[in-house]
């Protein structure tokens, strides 16, 4: 009988795109797999990924992740050229691709990468259909966030 693998404590999140939530209204989220090369998986295991400027584009019925930066490790393969910002194919089923294509065709919508994380042994990216925020929307979100912090502080001191 084989032993069960012990789950290692810690976060499965590799990278977050905090700027996306600040600059866009996220209307719908999808989980997609990534087609990666060996050196990219090693870099992700080391946590050397940045998705702050990444977005998704659809070409010929397939989805691709642009602008994601996976920094190669110093010990990566020497006989293979490592391109840190290469275009990576997203693995989605046909229904999800058609849904994304229909939403992107509407004016003002885009698809951005929200987070990069491990799910079991597979690397997944959470993408979101987004619409850009205006400056006044960003200000109102900031005021709401500050009010929530103040409210929590008031409630904490009210019980004393």
From Swiss-Prot:
The UniProt record lists the keyword Ligase: no
KW Transport (keyword) present: no
Keywords: Cytoplasm, RNA-binding
Cellular compartments per GO CC: cytosol
Disulfide bonds: none
PANTHER family to which the protein is assigned, alphabetical: SSRA-BINDING PROTEIN, TMRNA-BINDING COMPONENT OF TRANS-TRANSLATION TAGGING COMPLEX
HAMAP family recorded: SmpB
The protein, known as: SsrA-binding protein
